[in-house]
């Protein structure tokens, strides 16, 4: 049987295998990266007014070309010099070659968050109890001898006006009660009846001065009527202490009467204030009448003498 050499055409698979053996492997710099992050072209930026558009092309998982368009709105915000200098700092790491400003791929700018620190009320109460200075806040450490205010007597604003008046009043009261020496030429006091030493009860009508039946009270009452003023247009929240603080700078006060409602206990809007001296009452009328107090205009006038 004749034999001969026959030229056979190489198959396509053999050619591909031979090319794969002869070809050199691709370097890691040229090797195709992961299709998810592979960028076909550099991003293109287009700025139109305050609108910035970035367009780029990538390959997805199916090895298909995808076009990504991102649109940004440019806003101009005034910042302090320190913030502006901090934005010009040189970047490092993976963001070394990024342009100025935050990179949306690595940086997320969120809204400002306002923080409110809430403390426990029990802790505050414990601190107030432990602090000795807080206990002294409600106490009156310093008291003025002239106006009874919370300041030193040497710094009293009424020292020049009330000081001499109080001294003169103290001298008058001392002479009337016999605390000081009697003035020359004064009438001698009547001799008092001897006090019973048996320890028995003596009715007031049989005591010394019992027959006069209050004659000694008449001059004092007339003096109070002459130095009594009437204050009207008071608020419902007014108290005797408020009137004491309001009229005390004008002179020594002997009596304060504030008309109150029997059921509610609130002020009826008027009060009577009696001074020891008529001059002090006149000065109080001139100083307080027309004065704004507790959102009301006070009216001060002389009180009409009682008929009884």
Curated annotation (Swiss-Prot):
Give the source species: Xenopus laevis
UniProt-annotated stretches for the region Disordered: 1-35, 177-226
Gene Ontology cellular-component terms for this entry are: eukaryotic 43S preinitiation complex; eukaryotic 48S preinitiation complex; eukaryotic translation initiation factor 3 complex
Please report the stretch or stretches of sequence annotated as the RRM domain.
227-305
Among Gene3D superfamilies, the record links this protein to: 3.30.70.330
Function of the protein: RNA-binding component of the eukaryotic translation initiation factor 3 (eIF-3) complex, which is involved in protein synthesis of a specialized repertoire of mRNAs and, together with other initiation factors, stimulates binding of mRNA and methionyl-tRNAi to the 40S ribosome. The eIF-3 complex specifically targets and initiates translation of a subset of mRNAs involved in cell proliferation. This subunit can bind 18S rRNA.
GO BP annotation list: formation of cytoplasmic translation initiation complex; translational initiation
Q: Which UniProt keywords apply?
A: Cytoplasm, Initiation factor, Protein biosynthesis, RNA-binding
Regarding protein family, the annotation reads:
Belongs to the eIF-3 subunit G family.
Q: Where is the signal peptide?
A: none
| Molecular function as annotated in GO | RNA binding; translation initiation factor activity
Where mainly located? Answer: cytoplasm
InterPro entries assigned:
eIF3_g (IPR017334), eIF3g_N (IPR024675), eIF3G_RRM (IPR034240), Nucleotide-bd_a/b_plait_sf (IPR012677), RBD_domain_sf (IPR035979), RRM_dom (IPR000504)
**What interactions and quaternary structure are annotated?**
Component of the eukaryotic translation initiation factor 3 (eIF-3) complex, which is composed of 13 subunits: eif3a, eif3b, eif3c, eif3d, eif3e, eif3f, eif3g, eif3h, eif3i, eif3j, eif3k, eif3l and eif3m.
Provide ranges: composition bias, Low complexity.
185-194
Under what name is this protein listed?
A: Eukaryotic translation initiation factor 3 subunit G-A
Which Pfam families would you find in this protein's record? eIF3g, RRM_1
SMART domains linked = RRM
Where is this protein found?
A: Cytoplasm
UniProt feature, compositional bias: Basic and acidic residues? 209-226
């Amino acid at each position: 049987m004749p034999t001969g050499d026959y030229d056979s055409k190489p198959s396509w698979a053999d050619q591909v295998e031979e090319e794969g053996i002869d070809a050199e492997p691709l370097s890691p710099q040229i090797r195709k990266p992961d299709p998810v992050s592979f960028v076909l072209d550099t991003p293109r930026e287009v700025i139109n007014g305050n609108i910035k558009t970035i367009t780029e092309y990538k390959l997805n998982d199916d090895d298909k070309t995808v076009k990504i368009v991102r649109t940004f709105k440019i806003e101009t915000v005034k910042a302090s010099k320190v913030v502006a200098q901090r934005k010009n700092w040189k970047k490092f790491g993976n963001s070394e070659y990024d342009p100025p400003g935050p990179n949306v791929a690595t940086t997320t700018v969120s809204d400002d968050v306002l923080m409110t620190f809430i403390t426990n009320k029990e802790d505050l109460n414990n601190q107030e109890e432990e602090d000795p200075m807080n206990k002294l806040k409600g106490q009156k450490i310093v008291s003025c001898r002239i106006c009874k205010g919370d300041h030193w007597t040497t710094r009293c604003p009424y020292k020049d006006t009330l000081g001499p008046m109080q001294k003169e009043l103290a001298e008058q009261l001392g002479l009337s009660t016999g605390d000081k020496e009697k003035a020359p030429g004064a009438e001698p006091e009547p001799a008092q009846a001897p006090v019973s030493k048996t320890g028995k009860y003596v009715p007031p009508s049989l005591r010394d001065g019992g027959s006069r039946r209050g004659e000694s009270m008449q001059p004092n009452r007339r003096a109070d009527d002459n130095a009594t003023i009437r204050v009207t247009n008071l608020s419902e929240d007014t108290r005797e202490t408020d009137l004491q603080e309001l009229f005390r700078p004008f002179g020594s006060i002997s009596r304060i009467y504030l008309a109150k409602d029997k059921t509610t206990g609130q002020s009826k809007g008027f009060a009577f204030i009696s001074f020891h001296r008529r001059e002090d009452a006149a000065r109080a009328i001139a100083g307080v009448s027309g004065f704004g107090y507790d959102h009301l205009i006070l009216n001060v006038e002389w009180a009409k003498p009682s008929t009884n």
